[in-house]
């Protein structure tokens, strides 16, 4: 679970803050 979360986190931040 944690591995998947760490994988998805950057994409979520990118989508929310528009900062990649």
Curated annotation (Swiss-Prot):
Expressed by the skin glands. The keyword Secreted applies. GO terms for cellular component: extracellular region. One of its GO terms (biological process) is defense response to fungus. Its main location: secreted. It holds the Pfam family Antimicrobial_1. Keywords: Amphibian defense peptide, Antibiotic, Antimicrobial, Disulfide bond, Fungicide, Secreted. Disulfide bonds join 14-20. InterPro entries: Antimicrobial_frog_1 (IPR012520). It is found in: Secreted. Belongs to the frog skin active peptide (FSAP) family. Brevinin subfamily. Antibacterial activity against Gram-positive bacterium S.aureus and Gram-negative bacterium E.coli. Has activity against C.albicans. This is Ranalexin-1Cb. It comes from Lithobates clamitans.
């Amino acid at each position: 679970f944690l591995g998947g979360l760490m994988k998805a986190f950057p994409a979520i931040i990118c989508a929310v803050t528009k900062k990649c």
